[in-house]
UniProtKB/Swiss-Prot annotation:
Keywords: Cell inner membrane, Cell membrane, Hydrolase, Membrane, Protease, Serine protease, Signal. Transmembrane segments: none annotated. The keyword Signal applies. It holds the Pfam family TSP_NTD. GO terms for cellular component: outer membrane-bounded periplasmic space; plasma membrane. InterPro entries: ClpP/crotonase-like_dom_sf, PDZ, PDZ_sf, Peptidase_S41A, Tail-specific_protease, Tail_Prtase_C, TSP_N. Its EC number is 3.4.21.102. Residues 238-322 form the PDZ domain. This is Tail-specific protease. The keyword DNA-binding does not apply. It is found in: Cell inner membrane. It comes from Salmonella typhimurium (strain LT2 / SGSC1412 / ATCC 700720). One of its GO terms (molecular function) is endopeptidase activity.
Amino acid sequence: MNTFFRLTALAGLLALAGQSFAVEDITRADQIPVLKEETQHATVSERVTSRFTRSHYRQFDLDEAFSAKIFDRYLNLLDYSHNVLLASDVEQFAKKKTVLGDELRTGKLDVFYDLYNLAQKRRFERYQYALKVLERPMDFTGNDTFNLDRSKAPWPKDEAELNALWDGKVKFDELSLKLTGKSDKEIRETLTRRYKFAIRRLAQTNSEDVFSLAMTAFAREIDPHTNYLSPRNTEQFNTEMSLSLEGIGAVLQMDDDYTVINSLVAGGPAAKSKSISVGDRIVGVGQAGKPMVDVIGWRLDDVVALIKGPKGSKVRLEILPAGKGTKTRIITLTRERIRLEDRAVKMSVKTVGKEKVGVLDIPGFYVGLTDDVKVQLQKLEKQNVNSIVIDLRSNGGGALTEAVSLSGLFIPSGPIVQVRDNNGKVREDSDTDGVVYYKGPLVVLVDRFSASASEIFAAAMQDYGRALIVGEPTFGKGTVQQYRSLNRIYDQMLRPEWPALGSVQYTIQKFYRVNGGSTQRKGVTPDIIMPTGNEETETGEKFEDNALPWDSIDAAKYVKSDDLAPFGPELLKEHNARIAKDPEFQYIMKDIARFNAMKDKRNIVSLNYAQREKENNEEDALRLARINDRFKREGKPLLKKLDDLPKDYQEPDPYLDETVKIALDLAHLEKEKPAEQAAANK
């Protein structure tokens, strides 16, 4: 599953107010409203099209070929799993795919609305069929399987093939609940409520939903960071910028019927719990003292409305971990106000023998970061640390000015980043103060979620030879977006009945390193690459549809501060020797082997109860064995079952632990270098 990397989101969509209202059971297709374009949408479409075609960094023609691509994307947004529409439905509308560009320019979006209305009808038929399937006896003893990802599969050719897909879907839903311990009666009651609720949702869909989906299909076909924001999402964007969110600190998105964790806000309740990961699915939400509400199939904004609440109140989330497992867990979080100021740099000191390494954990490039880092550097200097590690893992970026000024703390002066617009004009952003605030050994730790401003800093430190970069190749987001309202001053005078018209966010520039290479797609390749664990590996700009290409420009004029390349072989040798014996890295290597062995089958799950229970038990047994291995090494009493795990238990961080050791290796080598140079000069 590719995710859209949103650098503007502080707590995702957790401030969206959903609309939930009572609706009687929908039993006929004619009870589903036929959605039509609202009067303001024609103007909005014209303005969006004009903005994208004239001002976007990627220069493109909204011709028939591009129109066809928009159609295909819209189709997949409507029916991601290819289990709602028939092949004949797709074929019927495919004849009109080349006219979408004209529709966007004129604002007459007939194809978009007609196709959406057909999908609504087909979705109603599917859930009606699913309710009938629930009446059948449950049997989980066969060898059936279910494909979790049908996004590349052909559309079903007839209703019989479609029914077979939904037989499997219902069986998957039933088995997922059975594995949580529910009885057959409870399973039927839960799924009946879920499917009827999904049908009622169809009656609550409005014209803006169709329009937003059409604009999203258009925007995403240009590049993955270009967006149309509906009036509601524009309000949310402005709320985020005013730093007044209250929630759990997570960016959410829909994936088929599931609400999925897209990313976590550093310092927020979800991140601090250490119990929620990117890719996890929220399947239930419960308020204090109230029963858990099944939210599978809900609209995203309504799930968000349940999660939101007053600061200090508690919310329970039923989490289905990423992957194909079906064992859920309940997590209780205390809602907090998510403010950018709360995401400040955190300093710690790691001791290895008699030596000390300072660690600066930077979750985001907020305004004021550089001044905060100066203060922490002074504290570390007083503690006489041997080396410093800057941890940029999961740092999605932030203020470009802070990336430049932070880089300036570690070099005398010089260009930090080059920025080019779509006219080819290049500017340099430089450090000019001539002051170095820290001259000692420096290591920067990155991962696949380090993006944008993080990559600018890491690239500058690497190009200047100022720091050793370790970890995973970074995300590869090397573009700049601009936000613009679609409202005009005269709108309210001429059309006072119109609501707000929303806004757009689109790409206008690209970043380039001082060596001339772009950070786009390729990101920053570490000097020492750590093995990647068992998480989803297809994360990064190069996996996003329509990501702008990598390219290069002339290098800026800069003078390297140092050259760490001669230390590379020795540092790598020591690193490899350590991780070959480190139990935590041995776990990681085994997970990699397991992941690769199952790669082709990771989306195919068994619908056999005994097989699935065996898989779940094996996962639990593996985790328990590893925890007990750690406890044994630490001299702690062993656990009999996972339920006995202390609530304050924290998983080790082998990547940071190893980076600290690399930082000490670098300090030793840099200390030896002057003596070697003096001997060579004699």
